[in-house]
């Protein structure tokens, strides 16, 4: 069988091309492994913006696992991109329950804080409360402080008062400095003021306007005429 020129080229491509693609694929995989290693290294070194650039690059190629997506959310949070933080974690938190409680607490907190900054106080409250039992005692004073404001902005005065009082107690119980103490005390007073019962003013309790001497005399004259 005689192999003509075009057939020979096609045959060579058939043999060589898969090998080239495989080699290129391996090089790409090695490059991506290096990118991931750099991303993790930057993340652990708290260089969140730099880490995020690598994570986003990898996320455009692969489906990242939940932990790396959670790392991305932390990076978004430290970049003050609260919208992307919540977009990432809202759908992810339920799949993070296999992680250690302390790690889960971090993700609940940054999602709650991001919702708070976005003025979505209802969802912020939910995440603060979910993360509270997973958090270290030293962190609970601030979380109660934030919970108090969530209730405050929803005009839930009694719940806000309870949370602010728990915040003060938590800081005191753990002997921690409380930079929010004065503001918390002010909020407690404000809630107590809102909870004071309002006194209804009825007609019987209204102050009576004293009659003038002229009107008294006029009334007396009228009564005398009636008697006559």
Language model segments and positions:
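Terminal, low-structured helical/coil segments at or just beyond the last alpha-helical repeat
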Residues: 161, 166-228
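Alpha-helical segment of the N-proximal tetratricopeptide repeat
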Residues: 30-57, 61
């Amino acid at each position: 069988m005689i192999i003509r020129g075009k057939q020979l080229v096609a045959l060579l491509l058939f043999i060589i091309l898969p090998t080239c693609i495989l080699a290129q694929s391996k090089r790409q995989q090695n490059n991506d492994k290096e990118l991931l290693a750099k991303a993790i290294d930057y993340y652990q070194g708290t260089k969140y913006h730099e880490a995020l650039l690598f994570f986003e690059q990898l996320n455009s190629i692969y489906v990242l696992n939940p932990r790396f997506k959670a790392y991305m959310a932390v990076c978004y949070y430290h970049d003050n991109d609260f919208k992307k933080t919540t977009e990432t974690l809202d759908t992810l938190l339920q799949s993070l329950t296999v992680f250690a409680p302390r790690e889960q607490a971090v993700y609940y907190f940054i999602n709650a804080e991001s919702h708070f900054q976005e003025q979505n106080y209802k969802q912020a409250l939910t995440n603060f409360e979910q993360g509270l039992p997973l958090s270290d005692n030293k962190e609970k004073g601030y979380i109660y402080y934030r919970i108090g404001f969530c209730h405050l902005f929803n005009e839930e005065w009694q719940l806000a008062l309870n949370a602010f009082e728990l915040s003060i107690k938590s800081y005191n119980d753990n002997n921690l400095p409380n930079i929010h103490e004065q503001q918390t005390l002010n909020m407690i007073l404000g809630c107590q003021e809102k909870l004071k019962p309002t006194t209804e003013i009825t007609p019987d309790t209204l102050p009576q306007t004293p009659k003038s001497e002229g009107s008294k005399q006029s009334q007396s004259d009228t009564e005398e005429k009636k008697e006559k």
